[in-house]
Amino acid sequence: HRPRALFLNSVLQNPLGTSLSPACAHRILQFAEQYGLWLVDDDIYRELAPANAPALAAMDGLHRVIYVGSFSKTISPSIRVGYVACAPALAAELARTKMIAGLTTSEINERLVHLVLTEGGHRKHIERLTDRLARARSRLCAQLTACGLSLLAKPDGGMFVCAALPEGTPSSREIAEHALTQGIMLAPGEFFVTQSEPCHWFRFNAAYSDDARLYRFLETTLRAAHAS
């Protein structure tokens, strides 16, 4: 069957934390128009991205873009409140489908989000959050490099950093399984790819990477791999 839709993260893509360039975003819109594709932009990290990051929905005028936003990354992960922006006719169909498939979102949670957004402090909260994440990412990148890992990409913002293991080390899945025995949870590259071949990189969350045990484990594991 011919593809009908493309799902993507236009900014702070998971797992790399990178964003589309304006030129790449424009090419994707041209591609969607050429082949009649819907573009579902899962843009849940937008508030954590630089202000100049391209916005597919704005560039497209919601012609082929279905924009998905969320507050779970900036207010609370337990809120589970988001929103969709799209063409009016499609919005009516999506609302009907949502009512049939899952009824409504919690009204209490929606009212809480409305209060947070209208009380006047949300923008300052985002500024503090992005500043804390920037400092945490900087520390994480420096510590991973010191342990002997190499960054796959320089994140544009957000919380994720991906780093590769040196050559000659076990797969990231093997290391992650060993880490679990030490009480450390890692996200191996195998979680984020479709092929079955072993990966040798991890996705790290800067918001949860301040524990010194993580870096001691990485240093010890890599030393053991090089010695064998």
Predicted regions and their residues:
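Helix C-cap/helix->beta junction micro-motif
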Residues: 34-35, 63, 182
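Active-site PLP attachment segment
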Residues: 58-93, 105-108
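Conserved glycine-rich beta-strand-loop-beta hairpin in the small C-terminal domain of fold type I
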Residues: 130-141, 151-164
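Conserved C-terminal alpha-helix-loop-beta "cap" of PLP-dependent enzymes
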Residues: 164-202
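PLP-dependent enzyme catalytic core of the Aspartate aminotransferase-like
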Residues: 181-182, 193-228
